[in-house]
Amino acid sequence: MSKHKPRHFQKNKFDNRAKTSAKQQFRQVKTGVKDGVFVYKGPLTVSEFCLKTNIPTANIIKHFFLNGVPLTLNSVLSTEQLADACVNFGFDFKVETEITHDNIISNIKFDDDPTQLSPRPPIVTIMGHVDHGKTSLLDAIRQTNTAAKEFGGITQKIGAYQVKNQEGKTITFIDTPGHEAFTGMRARGAQVTDIVVLVVAGDDGLKQQTEEAISHAKSAKTPIIVFINKMDKPTANPDMVIQQLNKFDLVPEEWGGDTIFVKGSALTKEGIQELLDSILLVAEVEDYKANFNAHSSGYAIEVQTTKGLGPTATIIVKRGTLKIGDIVVLGPAWGKVRTMQDENGVHLQEAMPSKPVQISGFDIVPVAGEKFIVFDDEKDAKLIANKFREQQKQKLNTTQINEELKQKIKSKEIKVLNLIFKVDSDGSLAAIKQAMQSIDVPGMSVNIIHSGVGLISENDIMLAKASGALLFSLNLGLSQVVKNIASLQGVKVDVHYHIPKLAEEIENILKGQLEPVYEDVELGRAEVLQLWYHSKVGHIAGTLVKTGKVKRGALCKLLRRNETIYEGRVDSLKSEKNPVNQMEAGKNCGIVINGCEDIQVCDIILVYEKQEVKSKS
């Protein structure tokens, strides 16, 4: 069907949406005293403060000295110390934020007239204890969706989806269950979720993660609906669950409280429609609205590199209408929206508030959890994104460790291993971070100074060199150009395809503070005789194994005229369309190398494995 084919829409020349102009948002703050009020935008030195207020420097230094804080003329006063000084010397004070290209994303404000607002669908996150049925509930809800059935039930995982209840009203679900994702978004200031559905197994009751989920939802002041799951089991005891939740002020309406409880089963789909109706009831009470007729803004919930599209992001629109051709800034990335599709794979021309869509057109991979804003000027958008990148680098170059850890480092009680990870997906990144938290080596710690989705770049190598960090790549190949830069800068890049092995290597390094030495042991070589291309797997090389053997999953190098062009892994190995584990010399086989786009007839695929070189004792 044509609706599933990518289309590049023309921008509507009669676009009447309210524009977002960066220049109109900019604000300068003039530090000084006006009408008895000292206005400032941030920390000042003692000398600067005295100059702006005409207070003698001796008086300021004496004031803080008597309070146990010795200062000099060049000492920097924090915003709290400035407030203290103002109160002591008879000034009112006011802290104002100066808005520039550097901080406009986090400080931009939209003053929409209430008459411009219209109801929007609620955005819901499922939370609860592991094994209580969060994922099963999401699947059950998805299967009730009439919109998906219109397209043959074909859906793709973009991180969020929409469903309709029996009356045709829409709800948006974030398809990343768990409070870790919820809290991670909030840590970046992203209040995406409107309603939390707390899943509790009726046969198991409250667990630690249930309590954590409640704390996170209450901290965000997000309404909670309780879904008591697994009611199809004979051991289910909903009254027990209700009593346990009472101490968290989650009391059902029939018990005199104001929390909605729904009893059901994700397995049998009992209670699903009641849950959807309850969500819409809360949404009606909370009155979620947005301005539809404005340049769009919202948040990214998933980012990745998608074959054929490049850097993509799944975003949820919170304000305005996003359209093809819009100029978007998303964290360090910017670009014009090139394609837009929903969870059913349908290519769209626009997305309205609460709508989740996957969009492409970015210059680099964005950052999940960051805010996106549509601007009317391409130059401003590019400058804002570049400023974000500069700030990231500054943060990365400042190792942020808690004070206790700093003291231990200074006293040489502890050593810190700086790490940089570049991976294939957000899921891999989360798994790596969890693996790092589980490493426990007395006297040692790991510090992830940078991590991201996408191939290793020259910037990653320069950061590794400047910080003395170890640089790791997971499930991604490595171009020869980047490898040459790393070699030139004296930076070692480790490519891994298994998280447990990566974690084991880092743990061994921590234990001995010695990097293991590996050597490449050749297994075999295959010559590329012909090429095919498949939309799902990329380039397929028809080869003849010339020496040794080729193994599926093995590391490999692509050689052209004896020069290494690419390093990766044998993702697929087939003999006459049948998957095989290995092929010996003299045999023909089809080979797919992960991430390799530049492959030619007569190239040589060198297959090898790494073996640790034992140190001489």
Swiss-Prot record:
GO molecular function, one term: translation initiation factor activity
Ranges where the record places region Disordered: 1-25
Binding-site list for GTP: 128-135, 175-179, 229-232
PROSITE patterns the record matches: G_TR_2, IF2
Family in the record: Belongs to the TRAFAC class translation factor GTPase superfamily. Classic translation factor GTPase family. IF-2 subfamily.
NCBIfam families per the UniProt record, alphabetical: IF-2 (TIGR00487), small_GTP (TIGR00231)
This protein's UniProt keywords: Cytoplasm, GTP-binding, Initiation factor, Nucleotide-binding, Protein biosynthesis
Bias-annotated ranges (Basic residues): 1-11
InterPro entries, per the entry: EF-G-like_DII, EFTu-like_2, IF2_II, P-loop_NTPase, Small_GTP-bd, T_Tr_GTP-bd_dom, TF_IF2_bacterial-like, TIF_IF2
Region named G5: 265-267
Record region (G4): 229-232
Spans annotated as G2: 153-157
Pfam families reported in the protein's UniProt record: EF-G_D2, GTP_EFTU, GTP_EFTU_D2, IF-2
PANTHER family linked: TR-TYPE G DOMAIN-CONTAINING PROTEIN (PTHR43381:SF5), TRANSLATION INITIATION FACTOR IF-2-RELATED (PTHR43381)
One Gene Ontology term, aspect cellular component: cytosol
Known role: One of the essential components for the initiation of protein synthesis. Protects formylmethionyl-tRNA from spontaneous hydrolysis and promotes its binding to the 30S ribosomal subunits. Also involved in the hydrolysis of GTP during the formation of the 70S ribosomal complex.
Region (G3): 175-178
Gene that specifies this protein: infB
Protein name stated in the entry: Translation initiation factor IF-2
Cellular localisation: Cytoplasm
Domain tr-type G: 119-288
Region (G1): 128-135
SUPFAM superfamilies, per database record: Initiation factor IF2/eIF5b, domain 3, P-loop containing nucleoside triphosphate hydrolases, Translation proteins
CDD domains: IF2_eIF5B, IF2_mtIF2_II, mtIF2_IVc
